[in-house]
């Protein structure tokens, strides 16, 4: 399967007209034979890509004390309990933060307050924070999340996720695609039989089918 994926990625990249901006490479997945009205059948996975996403991933950490200090070196923003309360009083600021942030990470002790102040904003967007347990290293967690994508179908049979950027090697992007498909094969009720078609494409380029 790896060779066929790499061939599809190579075609998608070579057939994409040159643009004056750096294009992403995206994966489009079409499901079949699933009742997506049932939340148990929906895809909702955070997947670490072995070759990275090829793009900046915006990460915000909710933390206090030493954890907050360590997070400042690696996260895009670090917010404490006072910031959290302020966001709870400013719905527009909370929505803006949610929209511009890819992933949130939070100390476990702050999760209850996050639910209280931001639950109605982050929950529907599927962006509730990843809890940081006392033994977790915040630096390692942030660095791992920088290479993570959220693969989510919702109620749609067709959904997309980022798998790289046009200046990455085709084999590196193929490795990312392979990891995503293998996770889906494991998670879906009927495995590969629940996947109708898979396509890879650059932002503005043609879609190229990935052979099953």
UniProtKB/Swiss-Prot annotation:
Any one of the GO BP annotations: translation
GO CC terms of this entry: large ribosomal subunit
Keywords for this protein: Repressor, Ribonucleoprotein, Ribosomal protein, RNA-binding, rRNA-binding, Translation regulation, tRNA-binding
MF annotations from Gene Ontology: rRNA binding; structural constituent of ribosome; tRNA binding
Alphabetical list of InterPro entries matching this protein: Ribosomal_uL1 (IPR002143), Ribosomal_uL1-like (IPR023674), Ribosomal_uL1/biogenesis (IPR028364), Ribosomal_uL1_3-a/b-sand (IPR016095), Ribosomal_uL1_arc (IPR023669), Ribosomal_uL1_CS (IPR023673)
CDD domains to which the protein is assigned, alphabetical: Ribosomal_L1 (cd00403)
Classification via HAMAP family: Ribosomal_uL1_A
Full protein name: Large ribosomal subunit protein uL1
Protein's organism: Natronomonas pharaonis (strain ATCC 35678 / DSM 2160 / CIP 103997 / JCM 8858 / NBRC 14720 / NCIMB 2260 / Gabara)
Organism taxonomic ancestry: Archaea, Methanobacteriati, Methanobacteriota, Stenosarchaea group, Halobacteria
């Amino acid at each position: 399967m790896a060779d066929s994926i790499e061939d599809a990625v190579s075609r998608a990249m070579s057939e994409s007209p040159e643009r004056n901006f750096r294009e992403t490479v995206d994966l489009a997945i079409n499901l079949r034979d699933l009742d997506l009205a049932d939340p148990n059948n929906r895809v909702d996975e955070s997947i670490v890509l072995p070759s990275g996403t090829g793009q900046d991933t915006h990460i915000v950490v909710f933390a206090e004390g030493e954890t907050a200090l360590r997070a400042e070196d690696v996260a895009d923003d670090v917010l404490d309990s006072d910031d959290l309360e302020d966001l709870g009083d400013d719905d527009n600021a909370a929505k803006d933060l949610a929209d511009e942030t890819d992933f949130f990470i939070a100390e476990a002790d702050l999760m209850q307050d996050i639910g209280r102040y931001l639950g109605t904003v982050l929950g529907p967007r599927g962006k509730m924070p990843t809890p940081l347990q006392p033994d977790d290293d915040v630096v390692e967690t942030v660095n791992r999340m920088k290479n993570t994508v959220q693969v989510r179908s919702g109620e749609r049979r067709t959904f997309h996720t980022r798998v790289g950027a046009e200046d990455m090697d085709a084999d590196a992007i193929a490795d990312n695609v392979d990891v995503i498909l293998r996770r889906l094969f494991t998670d879906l009720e009927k495995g590969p039989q629940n996947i109708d078609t898979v396509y890879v494409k650059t932002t503005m380029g043609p879609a190229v089918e990935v052979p099953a």
